[in-house]
């Protein structure tokens, strides 16, 4: 589409006649033409645009990060499958239910050691050493397992530490890789790798178990972990030039010597963040317990009427439950998360999950039916694994390097497991006090209100922290829009 704009020259002849006339031709492309041009120039970014706002030159890094977290979650779900028969047959379901307390205690020392190490080595050395250490651990577990050594409890504790430490470390690295503006746009795509990795790991675990034993999964997971170190290095090298020319970004320098717990206590933003994660995990674990309790009771009654074993009934119910969560989670991550963050903002995205949780448990309290709780838990878990997870990772973009690595490790490991432990204690005391399912649902209604309050406070603190960068970004967008407006018809 071409427009001719004619204007008279300001200069005139002595007789007063117009001496010349300028003709300016402006080419204005239609939306379809612009789309075709962008596809020809940046095909990968154009295709990724269906899921988020990816700009020229950003595709390689975001795809490497997406593949990295995909592999991490694939490895975790392989190990999760390997863990179950070892703990259930070796120690029993009761030991498993209380093992989160042991994980919490263990993570105090792990988080402290991680903070100590991060202050003495560079970023790449930190990530590589931690990841390869876990990979070597798997080789040791495999060697012990094939010799008949009982691994149930040790391996269960180890998997809990491995998952929280490596995933938190990955998101710390991703948060340091991007600016706040980039992270808000691109983290939804990285989150796709997390969602699909969870599904992929669970899918390939079954045929691998048939090929050998749970110990084979350990070797496969170890190989996957080694490959993630290479992917991390590629992203690190892609950003090395920028880091070398920008003295404000000492990306591979060791961190400061501040204690991680002290960082959280001194910083209002981090303290609210920690409380939110603690309450969130209490709600989640207590909700899991109530659903399982109602399921067992329902299975015993329904299975007898249907003529099937209670174990089969529970297995089919759980398969359906996780299928709904995984499927809806991937759909939300692909098509909804980026748009909610872009158009509604992080504050709205942060509050949606506790509101869904509050609605679900309030409805279940009024109508304590397993079908009602099923729908509520699916909605809560789906939003938590997609929208809430991506939003929480984006909230770290405004923090310091020390906070991204040290404080995040404490919050995503120790604080998270502490919430699990307090929930386990609540269940222990509640069952011995003969509390019914409705009593636990009432507790979760109250906890959901506290969760929503923490989300509001955290959203407000985040808005204050990002205000300066948002003003700068708005000014840049205004200048760009102003230059572009001169060329529009």
Which ranges hold each PLM region?
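Structural signature of the two symmetry-related core transmembrane helices
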Residues: 126-140, 348-362
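Small-residue-rich packing faces within the transmembrane alpha-helices of Major Facilitator Superfamily
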Residues: 108, 135-136, 226-229, 358-359, ...
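Membrane-embedded alpha-helical segments of multi-pass transporters/permeases
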Residues: 112, 139-143, 199, 229-234, ...
């Amino acid at each position: 589409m071409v427009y001719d704009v004619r204007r008279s020259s300001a200069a005139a002849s002595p007789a007063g006649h117009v001496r010349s006339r300028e003709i300016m031709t402006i080419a204005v492309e239609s939306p379809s033409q612009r789309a075709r041009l962008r596809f020809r120039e940046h095909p990968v970014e154009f295709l990724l645009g269906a899921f988020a706002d990816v700009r020229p030159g950003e595709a390689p890094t975001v795809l490497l990060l997406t593949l990295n977290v995909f592999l991490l979650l694939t490895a975790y779900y392989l190990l999760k499958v390997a863990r179950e028969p070892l703990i259930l047959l070796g120690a029993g379901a009761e030991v498993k239910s209380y093992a989160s307390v042991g994980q919490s205690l263990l993570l105090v020392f792990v988080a402290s050691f991680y903070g100590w190490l991060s202050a003495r080595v560079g970023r790449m050395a930190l990530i590589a050493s931690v990841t390869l250490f876990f990979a070597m651990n798997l080789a040791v577990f495999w060697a012990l397992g094939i010799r008949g050594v009982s691994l149930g409890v040790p391996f269960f504790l180890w998997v809990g530490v491995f998952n929280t430490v490596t995933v938190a470390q990955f998101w710390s690295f991703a948060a340091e890789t991007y600016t706040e503006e980039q992270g808000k746009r691109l983290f939804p795509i990285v989150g796709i790798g997390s969602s699909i990795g969870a599904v992929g790991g669970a899918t390939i675990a079954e045929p691998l178990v048939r090929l050998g034993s749970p110990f084979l999964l350990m070797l496969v997971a170890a190989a996957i972990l080694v490959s993630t170190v290479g992917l991390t290095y590629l992203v690190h090298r892609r950003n090395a030039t920028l880091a070398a020319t920008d003295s404000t970004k000492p990306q591979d320098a060791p961190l400061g010597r501040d204690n991680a717990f002290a960082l959280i206590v001194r910083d209002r933003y981090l303290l609210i963040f920690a409380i939110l994660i603690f309450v969130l995990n209490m709600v989640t674990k207590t909700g899991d317990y109530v659903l399982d309790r109602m399921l067992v009771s329902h299975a015993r009654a329904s299975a007898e009427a249907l003529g099937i074993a209670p174990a089969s009934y529970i297995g089919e119910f759980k398969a359906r439950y996780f299928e709904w969560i995984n499927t809806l989670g991937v759909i939300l991550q692909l098509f909804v998360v980026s748009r909610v963050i872009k158009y509604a903002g992080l504050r709205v995205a942060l509050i949606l999950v506790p509101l869904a949780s509050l609605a679900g448990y309030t409805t279940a309290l009024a109508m304590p039916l397993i079908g009602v709780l099923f729908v509520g838990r699916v909605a809560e878990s789906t939003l938590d694994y997609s929208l809430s997870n991506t939003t929480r990772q984006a909230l770290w973009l405004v923090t310091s390097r020390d906070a991204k690595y040290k404080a995040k490790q404490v919050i995503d490991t120790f604080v998270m497991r502490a919430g699990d432990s307090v929930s386990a204690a609540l269940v222990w005391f509640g069952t011995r006090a003969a509390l019914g399912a409705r009593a636990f649902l009432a507790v979760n209604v109250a906890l959901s209100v506290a969760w929503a309050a923490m989300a509001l406070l955290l959203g407000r603190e985040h808005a204050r922290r990002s205000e300066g960068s948002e003003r700068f970004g708005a000014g840049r967008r205004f200048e760009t829009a102003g230059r572009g407006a001169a060329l529009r018809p």
